[in-house]
Amino acid sequence: MTTFPRTVGVIGLGAMGTPMTGHLVAAGHDVMVLRHSLHKADGARPVDEPRHMASQADVVLLMVPGAPEIDALLPHLADGAAERDRERGGVVIAIGSTVSPDDVTRWHREHPDLTLVDAPVSGGEAGAVRGELSIMVGGAPSEVTPVLDVLAACGRPVHLGPLGAGQVAKACNQLICAAEIVALAEASVVAERAGLDLAELLELMQGGYAGSVVMADKTPKLVAHDYAVSARASFVHKDVSAYLDAARATGTASVLGGPLRDAAQRLVDAGLGEQDSAVFQRWVAERGAGEDATASTPDPSGTARALPGDRSDQPTPWTPGAGRDRTEDER
């Protein structure tokens, strides 16, 4: 992919956004951050408001926690986009946060004058630091090019389909991750109670069929019972809820989604949601023997809202069975 310097705004300099911003600066892009975050972004320049960012940038990357933060930001970004000199072209808002595909569709409807591309990332904080993220991009082919160009500095961006396709892909990714995290947590409790050396066991498992990036990442925390946060446990509920939205939209009765979401809700209700997701280990250990994780049969349909009709003058949002319209070098 041919890259050249662009003006990029980044909002959300947390565990993921901070190293990503560093890679964007290192790649030679003109990077803007909000003034209160400037101390986290060597080489970037400050702006006072999101509106100012949207009025100047080619791409604004949102790496905020979730949909409520994006709901609050988009009106200001829309104001900034409206102030742009027409000769400079429009700004693309790249949604790097993990949200429901339904949220992306709703924002597309509520802000028709904004160019939206969804670009959630996977690889965790370690992947962000290494610049080796898997980046799942959804949007119109004519609109994803600057996002693919910019995010190449942070990992491997791949255009998967129309607007919303990136969030569907990330939702599927997160179901698998959530299942692994909860399974690891529960298995670790059983193993320790049976007298096994957990460190030795997980090292052995890592070399077998159960081995995974998730296991490698969580093993030190599970062995040490260390729940210092790197990825908040409450995000499991948010992410699995997004997966259930995608499952509902495709007419899929989820087997794992409902129980995982309900387990995550109970963990949050127990006051553990702000700790690392490895805290599922503690939550499992503190529950009574034979206690069911769910009080009732979960709704397999999730919480999705109905998808609105397409607008002929806007990028086509993701819908079940939507075709892929990509150039060969984006595959």
Question: What are these model-derived regions, one by one?
Answer:
Residues 1-61, 125, 153, 158:
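NAD(P)+-binding Rossmann beta1-loop-alpha1 motif at the extreme N-terminus of oxidoreductases
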Residues 20-24, 107, 190:
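Hydrophobic residues within alpha-helices
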Residues 49-114:
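Rossmann-fold NAD(P) dinucleotide-binding segment
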Residues 96-174:
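Rossmann-fold dinucleotide-binding core
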Residues 135-137, 158, 163-194, 205-217, ...:
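Active-site-proximal catalytic alpha-helix in oxidoreductases
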Residues 163, 211, 217-277, 283:
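Interdomain hinge/lid region at the active-site interface
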Residues 271-331:
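NAD(P)-dependent dehydrogenase/reductase Rossmann-like domain
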